[in-house]
Amino acid sequence: MSDSLWHLYLLRTASGMLYTGITTDVARRLAQHQAGKGAKALRGKGELTLVFHCEAGDRSTALKLEYRVKQLSKQQKEKLVIDQPRLLTTLFLAS
């Protein structure tokens, strides 16, 4: 599983909150969240909408990228949703 391609995703709750996560299968993970079997932070938050996702490389890179995105302000996350960049690794993890 370490060779799997990971993805970073953002979900919007009914109240407008943005949730950031990583997975190897975006559709499966969204279904888990919608069924209340995903992150506790999303339980009882109403309808969830996938508003952004992109490839994030291997698990290690995905975890680093997730951390960086979670540090962004809501305004910066909204810009990601609007701009829909295909690769965040070049934006956040460049040496």
Swiss-Prot record:
Pfam families: GIY-YIG (PF01541)
Domain GIY-YIG: from-to ranges: 4-79
Family label: Belongs to the UPF0213 family.
Source organism, top-level taxon: Bacteria
Protein name (database record): UPF0213 protein YPK_3712
Species of origin: Yersinia pseudotuberculosis serotype O:3 (strain YPIII)
